[in-house]
């Protein structure tokens, strides 16, 4: 199920007597991320930087090379936390339309509680002024962490940067920060969303660091870490060669020819 791009009819009326919600397990049926990794496998992925993971995924040829990752607009707020790995809990939200009443937030918390752990909350802004939107601050981040989330990914604004940094272990990925929360409303929960070119569905495995965020296809998730090690080994050979004194283009070509055959 994809997000409609707007709130449901009752949401538009400001009533919020109905918020689209699908049982988490039912949403995952048929999705690639139904098979979950072990804690050890997740820890192994967390020790690897996201660009290396991206390079490893390319080796499996399971998607196009310009698919599966977010653009530069979604920035890592706390690079000192290292790599964030978790399963997506998705929703749409609007904080810039006046006079709305929110009855969807508890639905989100219920979805986070039921989701595979660690979880990453993914919030798609569908309001009328995304540059002034705000979808999470200290209270929501603290609640999310208590329920097993390790971060929030949003194409809208977030806030309370210092307080959320002080939580430790909770990452923000967003375009920027906003001082006021406006009129925050959760519209739909457990829907497929697209943020800055990255399409995310409920249960998708996310991997992100200071370089950005991507989705690891479940069909290869248990093999990506091992492939990433091979990528690192190959890159180490290239780096060792080009760091030698007196490098020439001719020598580089000869090396590359031998390296690729």
Regions found by a protein language model. Give the residues of each.
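Ala/Thr-enriched low-complexity intrinsically disordered regions
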Residues: 3-6, 19
């Amino acid at each position: 199920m994809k997000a409609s791009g707007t709130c449901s009819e009752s949401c538009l009326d400001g009533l919020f007597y109905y918020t689209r919600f699908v049982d988490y397990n039912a949403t995952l049926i048929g999705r690639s991320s139904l098979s979950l990794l072990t804690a050890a496998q997740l820890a192994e992925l967390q020790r690897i930087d996201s660009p290396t993971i991206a390079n490893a995924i390319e080796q499996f040829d399971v998607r196009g090379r310009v698919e599966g990752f977010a653009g530069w607009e979604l920035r890592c707020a706390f690079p000192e936390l290292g790599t964030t790995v978790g399963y997506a809990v998705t929703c749409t939200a609007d904080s810039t339309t006046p006079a709305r009443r929110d009855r969807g937030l508890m639905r989100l918390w219920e979805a986070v509680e039921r989701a595979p752990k660690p979880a990453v909350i993914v919030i798609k802004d569908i309001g009328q002024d995304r540059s002034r939107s705000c979808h999470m601050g200290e209270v929501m981040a603290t609640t999310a962490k208590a329920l097993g989330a390790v971060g929030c990914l949003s194409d809208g604004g977030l806030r309370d940067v210092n307080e959320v940094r002080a939580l430790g272990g909770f990452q923000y990925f967003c375009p920027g920060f906003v001082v006021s929360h406006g009129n925050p409303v959760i519209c739909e929960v457990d829907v497929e969303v697209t943020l800055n070119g990255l399409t995310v569905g409920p249960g998708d495995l996310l991997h992100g660091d200071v370089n950005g965020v991507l989705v690891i296809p479940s069909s290869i998730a248990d093999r990506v870490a091992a492939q990433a090690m091979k990528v690192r080994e190959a890159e180490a050979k290239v780096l060792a060669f080009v760091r030698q004194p007196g490098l020439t283009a001719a020598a580089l070509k000869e090396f590359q020819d031998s390296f690729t055959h």
